[in-house]
Each structure stands twice: as structure tokens, then as C-alpha cells.
Amino acid sequence: MKTLSVLPLLCFQFSPRNVESSIKYFLVQSFRAAIILKLALMQAWLYSSWSVVKTPKFFISSGLIMALGLKMGLFPCHYWFPDVVQGAGFLQGLLLSTWQKVAPLVVLGYVCKCDKSRILLIMGALSVLVGGWGGLNQTQTRKILAFSSIAHIGWICVLISYSFRVRVIMFLVYTIINSRVFLLRKEFGLTSLSMFGRLLNYNPVRGVIVVLGVLSLGGLPPLFGFLIKFLALECLVYEGAFFLRFILVLGSLIRLFFYLRVGFKRRLVYFPQHSIRMFVWRRKILNTRVRYLYVLVLRVLSGLNLLGILSSPLLVSFLKK
């Protein structure tokens, strides 16, 4: 039902790229649903149980984790996700990167409730690395955000086996930061990296706001994105997962590198142009109330994003309860 409800939103503009993105998403999700249904029937036939809390056989739980990883775009089933996000609009990409991942994460939490799943840990850790390496050679902002989504969901999947509170807070923080970045890029039409340099020349204040959102998504201290990664690493150290922590830090540093490139390199090497040619001058005029609501949402998200280290006592006290 979620897949069928998202398909009209993906092809809302009815362009060739939107239709292609919708078809890819439908085929992938149909294949995933068929796998889950097959595994459920096998478990009901062999063990007379429909529960996913504790599956009796390894191959059933492993197949279920792989199918849910396919839905979220985890490694090694991540190839479809960047193309679908690139073909969709910014709002549709935001929907695929946040809301569509809630149900699979909840089911994974039930599957791994009793014991730690090594397959999920491996998929999550490798997703962080793939999310970092995949974004290095990209110039389209939606593909960069797609690989960033793969990496962040990898972090959350690793934390599923360790801490419920940390993974919930991390997903909420990721949703806030990602929503802000997607909405700002939609507002200013930032479809490629070259547009960042133009925005900084055209309106430095807005350009700095966008760059801060991007750097927060990459985890640069003392912004909000760094705080939640620090708490996640503290949780992994407490559990003794030192090698896993090393992999996550390595993937995050790689991802932070291309976010720094987005924020600074285009500013330094972009050839100066007149601001009259920076952006398309014909833009849609929104309704006054819709416009005010849109600006209010962006300001709230920007304020939450810039809290950073100031909100650390509140989060630490919540986690220690």
C-alpha cells in the first residue's frame, strides 16, 4: 500500500525522468514484497508461525533482512536508490529518503530484538563506506543526497543491535537536517554543484545557510549532525565494537570530504559572473499563506540544525535515563 501510494507522487510532474524513476521504484518494491511474502509463507508452512520477533531459522531471518535492505537501499541492494532519487523531484526525494524508511526500520528492530544480526551489521557498515565512496565523483545534488541517505541509514541499522534510543534520536535528527537541505535546494534550484558557487555570489547569506546545512549533514563539529554521530560512537565504544566504530568513522570522513568540497571548493574556483545571469528569473509565485508557512518551516529547521553542541546536555540526559 505504501508503494502504490508513493507512485502517483513520483510521477506527479509526468516527465520522462519521473516516469522512469516511478517504474524503477515499482519494480524494485514489487520484487521486495514478493521476497517477504515468500519468506512469510515458508515460515508459516514449516513452523506454523507468522511472527517476525524471533524467526526460528537463519536463512529466513537473513532473507527478511536482505529484503528490507533492498527496500531501504542498503548495500549490496543500493544501486536503484540514487537513480530513483535523481529522477524524482526534491520533495519526492525527501519522501523516499525519510518517511519510506520508517516501516522497514521498525520491522528490522523487531527482527533483531532478541540477538544481534551480523548480516545487518555488515550491511550497515558497508553502506556507510559505499555512501562515502559513491558521492565522491558525483556532480548532481540529488545523487549526492541519495548516497548520503544510504550512509545515514547504514549508521541507524548498525545502532539497531545496540541502542533503541540512540537510533531513534539519530533518525529524527537525520530527518530534520535532510528536510532542511532538500527544501533549501528546491527553493534555490540547486540541481548541480556549480549552482552553489552561483548562489554564494548571488546571495552570500543564503549561500552560507545552505553550506551550513550541508556540513551539518556531513557531521562537521559543532553542528547538529556531528553531535548525534558522537553519541552513536560513544554507544559503540561502550559496547566494545571498536572495529565497527573504525569503519563508520572512515566512511563518515570520506563523506565529509565531498561535503567540504561542496561548501568551499565551488566558492574558491568558480569563475566570477554577473549576478543577473545566476538564476532563472521566471519563478512560480506561491500563495501568500503557503509562502509564509514554507518560510516558517525553513526557519524552524535551520534553528534546529544550528543548535549543535548547545543541545548536547539535553540529549545526554535523555540517553542516561
Residue ranges and their predicted role:
Residues M1-K321:
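Alpha-helical transmembrane segments of multi-pass membrane proteins predominantly involved
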